[in-house]
């Protein structure tokens, strides 16, 4: 995105978000959400997060990255899911990322023609991941909020955080972000220990099933 950083100088603006091509993406999110940049600090943060993450998302998918649980695919998945959650914070209750991606492609397609060539594929990847995450986020957030309400207001138990991940598929990084917003914490070290124990149990179960297959 070096061209847009150069545009900061050419257009005489102090922030990447004030460059016209980037501002148009933010305006698209504002239009969908019915919110305006400058309404509040929380609104501005969410608008910036979505704008930043959808730009990165579109470029990564165009480069051949797909959402997964490891490597660059995990980074992409986190970007997409964090943007979707900030959409929820803005009151957006329908799939919207593909619409915003269209604006990214429109604004950047001249400099990056491959975005236009691959736009159908880009939309498909985004739509599939957003649909998958929407099934998780609403129920997960409701359960997390219940657990926060029942806590001491300072720390969520690692066992609760792990249950959200293991049983409901709610990502730990999203749990940590919600807790931070509430001024709370959880033990990542204890969460990782529980995760490792679960993986070890799964390995043992697979081994037992394999042994049974030879009997």
Regions found by a protein language model. Name each.
Residues 1-215:
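A glycine- and charged-residue-rich anion-binding loop/surface
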């Amino acid at each position: 995105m070096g061209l847009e950083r150069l545009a900061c100088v050419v257009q005489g603006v102090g922030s990447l978000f004030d460059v016209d091509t980037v501002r148009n993406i933010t305006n698209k999110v504002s239009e969908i959400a019915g919110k305006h940049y400058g309404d509040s600090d929380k609104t501005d943060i969410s608008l910036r997060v979505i704008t930043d993450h959808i730009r990165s998302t579109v470029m990564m998918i165009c480069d051949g990255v797909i959402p997964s649980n490891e490597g660059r695919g995990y980074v992409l998945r986190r970007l997409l899911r964090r943007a979707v959650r900030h959409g929820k914070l803005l009151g957006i209750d329908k799939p919207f990322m593909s619409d915003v991606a269209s604006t990214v492609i429109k604004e950047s397609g001249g400099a990056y023609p491959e975005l236009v060539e691959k736009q159908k594929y880009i939309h498909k990847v985004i739509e599939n991941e957003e649909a998958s995450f929407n099934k998780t986020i609403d129920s997960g957030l409701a359960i997390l909020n219940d657990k926060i309400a029942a806590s001491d207001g300072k720390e969520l138990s690692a066992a609760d955080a792990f249950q959200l991940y293991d049983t409901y598929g709610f990502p730990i990084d999203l749990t940590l972000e919600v807790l931070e917003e509430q001024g709370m914490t959880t033990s990542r070290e204890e969460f990782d220990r529980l995760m490792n124990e679960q993986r070890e149990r799964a390995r043992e179960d697979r081994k037992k099933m394999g042994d049974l297959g030879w009997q």
